[in-house]
């Protein structure tokens, strides 16, 4: 699917994506003005709760309590995050096999093995990965990977809803050349934005990607009542319910790889369903788009 894309996009915050030659200016991570989530182990954190649901080890009692409340509200949430993870591994293997060597993971969360850099390095040991998150615990974990001598990994502090400063901060690492094809990952983050904002944000990012770039998106789709309950349970973030039509619209201007937007459990490159995929409450919808 294709559509006209604006040449000077703005983020939901009104930031114009500009810079020399029309590209975002290099902005040091500390200068983005992005609000950070303060580290407090006595308060629940969604990234650490997610890590717990995936079987990770970087969490505290309040995070496990939050995860327990989420499971009580919607017992399928653990399966959802695991479906998302399995899809991401398949998607990254596919993209890496196409020769993409640059990756930007928006709202990365705590690294879970296999992490993005571990997956893509199966195909190219020199692939560069920059992780973006607004949680200092996540950033510290990810930067520790680079501190171990990996010259092709970095992490920047950023609010994914503000494309201009995020793209500038990523560029400032020196690991990503926006003039070359990039794989942009937005996995399980767009349900924290309303549909209109999510469309604006994804359009702002994709409009500045080089031709041949790949965009991976996954979105948790549940019943509106469940999203409202989760919002009340975890008051640090609001969760929005997106329809299949919303998720398709996040790929506006991109060519979708078959089977297009589909249930993450069934998504495989080149697979084509004989009938429209059934929508079900509590599913993860996923897809990969390519820029022209």
Q: Predicted regions: what is each one?
A:
Residues 176-190:
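Short SAM/SAH-binding signature in class I
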Residues 189-192, 220-224:
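Short "lid" loop at the C-terminus of a central beta-strand within the Rossmann-like core
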Residues 1-158, 162-164, 168-178, 206, ...:
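Rossmann-like AdoMet
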Residues 222-237:
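Short, glycine-/aromatic-enriched active-site segment of Class I SAM-dependent methyltransferases
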Residues 156, 182-186, 201-202, 208-220:
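Conserved beta-strand signature within the Rossmann-like core of class I S-adenosyl-L-methionine
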Residues 267-292:
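Core SAM-dependent methyltransferase catalytic element
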């Amino acid at each position: 699917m294709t559509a006209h894309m604006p040449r000077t996009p703005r983020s939901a915050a009104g930031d114009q994506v500009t810079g020399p030659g029309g590209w975002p200016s290099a902005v040091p991570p500390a200068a983005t003005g992005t609000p950070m989530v303060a580290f407090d182990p006595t308060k629940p954190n969604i990234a650490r709760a997610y890590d717990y649901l995936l079987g990770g080890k970087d969490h505290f009692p309040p995070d496990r309590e939050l995860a327990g409340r989420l499971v009580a509200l919607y017992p399928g949430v653990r399966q959802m995050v695991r479906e998302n993870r399995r899809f991401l591994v398949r998607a990254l293997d596919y993209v890496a096999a196409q020769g993409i060597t640059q990756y930007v993971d928006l709202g990365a969360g705590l690294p879970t093995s296999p992490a993005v850099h571990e997956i893509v390095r199966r195909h190219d040991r020199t692939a560069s990965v920059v992780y973006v998150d607004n949680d200092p615990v996540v950033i510290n974990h990810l930067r520790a990977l680079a501190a171990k001598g990996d010259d092709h990994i970095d992490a920047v502090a950023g609010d994914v809803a503000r494309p201009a400063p995020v793209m500038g901060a990523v560029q400032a690492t020196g690991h990503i050349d926006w003039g070359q094809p990039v794989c942009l990952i937005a996995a399980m983050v767009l349900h924290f934005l309303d549909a209109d904002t999510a469309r604006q944000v994804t359009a702002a990012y994709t409009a500045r990607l080089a031709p041949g770039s790949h965009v991976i998106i996954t979105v948790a789709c549940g019943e509106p009542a469940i999203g409202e309950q989760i919002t009340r349970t975890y008051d640090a973030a609001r969760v929005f319910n997106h329809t299949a039509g919303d998720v398709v619209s996040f790929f506006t201007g991109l060519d979708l790889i078959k089977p297009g937007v589909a249930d993450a459990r069934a998504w495989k490159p080149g697979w084509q369903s004989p009938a429209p995929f059934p929508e079900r409450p509590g599913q993860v919808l996923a897809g990969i788009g390519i820029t022209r």
